[in-house]
A protein has these predicted regions:
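Structural motif
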Residues: 8-11, 34, 74, 118
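Short loop/turn motifs at secondary-structure junctions and domain boundaries
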Residues: 107-110
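Core segments of cupin and vicinal oxygen chelate
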Residues: 11-14, 20-64
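A generic local structural motif
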Residues: 4-8, 55, 68-71, 103-104
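N-terminal beta-strand motif that seeds the catalytic metal site of vicinal oxygen chelate
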Residues: 2-30, 79-82, 132-134
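Vicinal oxygen chelate
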Residues: 15-24, 54-61, 65, 71-99, ...
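A common structural junction motif
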Residues: 37-40, 100-104
Length: 134
């Protein structure tokens, strides 16, 4: 056993960094959170092969946690998600996979951090995101 056994390794996750809401219209949600709630934009990035996706994060000034405003996944509204942060996405991926957790393969696009998606037993989405500050 020992540390070479990934099932015995401690978690590398250090923070719940992002809560994710599914919104019908990212621009309308952005206007609400910035104009009415006083949040600031933390990220607004196009990604994907043809820039077809938009990652949009807002937060209250000074907050370390962010709120992502996501379009519906798989064209269906609903479904909760959180983003958790780790300094080593690949180590956490290996650890969870060794424990029998179904995880998607890590992915990275220019301008976005390396990450992978997984679900808890109830189907809630969890994005495991590599951060240099985690």
């Amino acid at each position: 056993m020992g540390m070479s056994d990934p099932t015995q390794a401690p978690t590398t996750v250090t923070n719940i960094g992002v809560a994710m809401f599914t919104v019908a219209d990212q621009n309308a949600a952005l206007a609400f959170y910035t104009e009415k709630m006083g949040f600031e934009v933390r990220a607004d990035v196009a990604f994907g092969e043809n820039g077809e996706y938009r990652w949009l994060e807002v937060a209250p000034p000074g907050s370390t946690a962010r709120l992502a405003l996501n379009p519906p996944m798989n064209d269906e509204p609903g479904g909760s998600a959180i983003g958790i942060e780790t300094a080593d996405v690949h180590a956490e991926h290996a650890r969870l996979k060794a424990l029998g957790v179904e995880v998607e393969e890590p992915m990275s696009s220019p301008g976005t951090p390396t990450m992978f998606m997984m679900r808890d037993p109830d189907g809630n989405h969890i994005a495991v995101v590599e951060t240099s500050g985690a």
